[in-house]
Amino acid sequence: MTEEKTPKQIVELLDKYIIGQNEAKKSVAVALYNRYRRLQLPKQMQQDITPKNMLMAGPTGVGKTEIARRLAKIVDAPFVKVEATKFTEVGYVGRDVESMVRDLVEEAVRMEEKEQFDRVKLQATKKANNRLVKLIVPGIKRENRENSMQQMMQMLSGNFNMNQAQDNEEVTDDIRNERLSVADQLNKGLLENREVTIEVEQAPKVNPMGDMMGQMGIDMSSLMGDLMPKKTVKRTLKVSDAREVLIQEESKKLINYDSLYQRAIERTQQNGIIFIDEIDKITAGNKKTSGEVSREGVQRDILPIVEGSTVSTKYGPVSTDHILFIAAGAFAESKPSDLIPELQGRFPIRVELNALTQEDFVKILKDPQNSLLKQYIALLKADGIKLVFTQEAIDRIAQIAFEVNQGTDNIGARRLATILEKLLEDVLYEGPDMNMGEITITQKYVDQKLSDIIINKDLTKFIL
């Protein structure tokens, strides 16, 4: 997390993507900045300051998930979204609540790995190009009994690398000169479409037993990988594609994964964000039959994770003491007070998000960075078509979205995507074959395409 991003700056960045909901934006910005404040305190006091977890209540499609997702991107924090209804009480078949922490660690590992790949890419590319040169211009193989026995022992121990075979070769002056020539051509990009055959490590098969062990924090693939020799397969690829594969291989050799995993765990513990959606669906306010899994039991399983506990993962133990939890739900048939009291107390910040108005829809269509209209304009630009929306057309689209939400299920801003897809289906279908340089979407066109559907309520429910 960076010093520069104050709560006000975080809100300004969120404003680029999310319309309205200022109270929610302020709350998440303050909760996030409090992490930075905590890290400035003495170590002893840091342990006593817990994150101010948040409970968002509001109808679907008003920006609950988007606020949390954008927040994580802004501060480059590990982020996972889970649905409370997917978890089952301990003792039942299904996902256990600790899996959300394991998913978060996996995301942190992926982020750390990407950063390390970027750091070593130059060095890995150089090594990959050297390997390509040797593949294009192979040396003269020299086999002897001692080397064969040594390779067999390495294969049995799982340490044999097929690329080691290149070391057991004789390089004459002619081969050396040809390799210099090929290296020069590679650097100039003259051999990108030439095909080469490379040996790559075979992806391990998915093992259901291994997945179960992973849920218990045991990495079976790593344990078995140390005992069994690594299998390789031959693939014929273009030089440009082969280089990418080899860069990945060489990058992994240059990275200290033990150190990477430790950083990923620390990143998870200090910066991780877990978004628990549909938490209202596991409250006592939702009717349940005697045959259903106890939803209150799921709440009690979630409680120690949110409260602060240690979860075993295949990368090591992870403390959840300072992970930020954001829970969200529509609470249409229940209320936050229907949660068990202990869990309520772990979400001290309560934010209510407002239903979107017609004016909000107009802003959502136009204002955000990469808004829906900007996305469709960019898509059709690929066909050489300039797509233009008049202000009257935008107002009419917003009005239709608002009215359909009022008359049927209110799905918030998601209604706009459905309406635009129906409105532009002919243009998107015929676009590649049209020679028109510009298409203007007017209010009249919007009414022509959508009026019949809006009048017929049954069609509205089915299509929009």
From Swiss-Prot:
GO CC annotation, single: HslUV protease complex
Keyword Heme attributed: no
Biological function: ATPase subunit of a proteasome-like degradation complex; this subunit has chaperone activity. The binding of ATP and its subsequent hydrolysis by HslU are essential for unfolding of protein substrates subsequently hydrolyzed by HslV. HslU recognizes the N-terminal part of its protein substrates and unfolds these before they are guided to HslV for hydrolysis.
GO annotation (BP), single: proteolysis involved in protein catabolic process
A Pfam family the protein falls into: AAA_2
Self-association and partners: A double ring-shaped homohexamer of HslV is capped on each side by a ring-shaped HslU homohexamer. The assembly of the HslU/HslV complex is dependent on binding of ATP.
Amino-acid positions noted as binding ATP in the UniProt annotation, renumbered to this chain: 19, 61-66, 277, 342, 414
Annotated family: Belongs to the ClpX chaperone family. HslU subfamily.
Subcellular location(s) of the protein: Cytoplasm
Record's protein name: ATP-dependent protease ATPase subunit HslU
GO molecular function, one term: ATP hydrolysis activity
Primary location group: cytoplasm
NCBIfam families in the record: hslU, PRK05201.1
Source organism of the structure: Lactobacillus gasseri (strain ATCC 33323 / DSM 20243 / BCRC 14619 / CIP 102991 / JCM 1131 / KCTC 3163 / NCIMB 11718 / NCTC 13722 / AM63)
Superkingdom: Bacteria
InterPro entries: AAA+_ATPase, ATP-dep_Clp_protease_ClpX, ATPase_AAA_core, Clp_ATPase_C, HslU, P-loop_NTPase
Alphabetized UniProt keyword annotations: ATP-binding, Chaperone, Cytoplasm, Nucleotide-binding
